[in-house]
Amino acid sequence: MRRTIIKVCAILIGILCMFYMYKVYVGYQMVKGIVDQPPIVFSVRFKNGDRGTFKYNIKNRKYEKISDYIFQELSYSDDYEKIIGVIWEDRFQGLAELDMEDYTLRPIISLKDLNKCVKEVNLKEIEYDGPGVTQLRMPKYYKDGYTFFWGYYSTAICYIREEDGKWNIRILNNTDSTGHNYFLKEEQETLFLETEKPFVENKTETGIIIKKTIDKDDEIVLVDVTDENSFIDMPDDMTKIVYYSEPKIYMYNLETDKKNYISSQFLIWQHMLYLKLSSDGRYLFYTVGDIPFFWSDYYRMNFFIVDTKTGNKVNLNRWEKGDRFYGIDW
């Protein structure tokens, strides 16, 4: 009897070892197959005191500092040659961009000048009260200018453009609900907006994804019930939307009006945070944040990458407790 138990245990251990080795091999092959992709970029203040903006190599899982400035809420340009972000430090407050070739920083517009702009459209000014989390969110390149959420609750999407040395501003969308993320399709001036949907009956909030034309009242709900903590993403051609509805990650096809299952991510005292597609839309990078005990600290970040065609998944990194991330893009 004892020998039988030992034999069964040995077989089970052997099966588990083989399964683990298989998963490692599949993950290695998947990461090896990711070619011609820009690096992941993120801004962070590490527990050890180091801070700034970094680029992350998926294949060797190493990171390199590219700026001493923390580019909060950062995002790539369409050609991946620059990133735009919010600088929220004593030495500068406002929008800035970073050249991804030589890593030079160029201020775009200061908070002081932004406040002058928003006065023209009757939005409340934002005051700088020291380094921390900015109230200027999700800056992006759009046409020959820039867009962003204005204010803590991110209800207004603004578009600014400099012409003859003067900044012009236009409100593209303004609602009563907090905005999570947005995408703009230039040709049709179409807005894809992830926002909150309050459920009065159970007093919780979930997200919805809507589509509308700027300056028109033609709002359509594309996806109902998304996770309120995670951010949607779209590929460069804006034909699909990737989103998380616990515990599953889906890809919604705008052309067929159907959703496809990609993978599952079960959360235990965690939140799904960033979802970022590769430039070709084949791979999905996402982050899961461990919730600190009694919210005594920041999320402990975990990096994952999944093949949207096969569902194969790799855990790239588990960062240290106390590392605070301010923005990620791929």
Per-region residue spans from a language model:
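Sequence signature of WD/YWTD-type beta-propeller architectures
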Residues: 6-15, 19-330
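N-terminal Lys/Arg-rich, disordered targeting/topogenic segments
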Residues: 1-3
